[in-house]
């Protein structure tokens, strides 16, 4: 067989073998301060380093905040670029309950790109309200610093003020864990 043809067959075979977990959207993407914030969930996932979040067997979902720059971003990020060094807090309430689930998403990367996320244990199937609180890089004094040019020639606009986005979604389960 011709080497180029063989390479093409191997490439197609490898691409077909790539598994992608099914992401379920939560509401519609929202736009704030030159950013698009998209909420999704999927099956809970094993993560590295070990201990950074709940193990898949102890969680119901892996929730994500996909935050990328819009063309109007005034902080120097090109369109569709991931925005790093944010603090993204979440709060989840199930309809009919006053109990809240809350935490802070961690920055991470997967085969579909950078995002903030966490493995979360919900309160069973039902309707949920979900709130993200998005804080700029300078709002977390305990984190690493992320510099911002402020001079007239190379500077960018000041960081945005913290804001919330809210979503509602119905959780019916995700099927067999690990059954992508």
Where do the model's predicted regions map?
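Short, compositionally biased P/S/T/A/G/V-rich stretches that sit at domain boundaries
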Residues: 21-57
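Short acidic/polar inter-strand loop motif in beta-rich domains
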Residues: 135-146
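Short tyrosine-centred short linear motifs in exposed loops/low-complexity segments
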Residues: 114, 122-128
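Sec/Tat signal peptide C-region and signal peptidase I cleavage site
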Residues: 14-21
């Amino acid at each position: 067989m011709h080497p180029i043809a063989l390479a093409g067959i191997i490439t197609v075979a490898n691409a077909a073998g790539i598994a992608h977990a099914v992401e379920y959207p939560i509401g519609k993407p929202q736009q704030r301060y030159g950013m698009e914030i998209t909420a999704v969930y999927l099956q809970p996932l094993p993560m590295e380093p070990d201990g950074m979040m709940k193990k898949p067997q102890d969680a119901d979902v892996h929730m994500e905040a996909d935050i990328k720059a819009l063309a109007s971003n005034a902080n120097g990020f090109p369109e569709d670029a991931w925005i790093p060094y944010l603090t993204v807090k979440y709060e989840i309430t199930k309809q009919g309950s006053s109990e809240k689930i809350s935490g802070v998403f961690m920055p991470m990367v997967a085969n579909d790109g950078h995002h903030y996320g966490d493995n979360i244990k919900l309160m069973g199937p039902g309707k949920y309200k979900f709130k993200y609180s998005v804080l700029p890089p300078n709002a977390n004094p305990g984190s690493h610093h992320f510099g911002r040019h402020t001079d007239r020639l190379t500077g960018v606009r000041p960081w945005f003020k913290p804001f919330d986005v809210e979503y509602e979604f119905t959780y019916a389960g995700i099927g067999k864990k690990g059954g992508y």
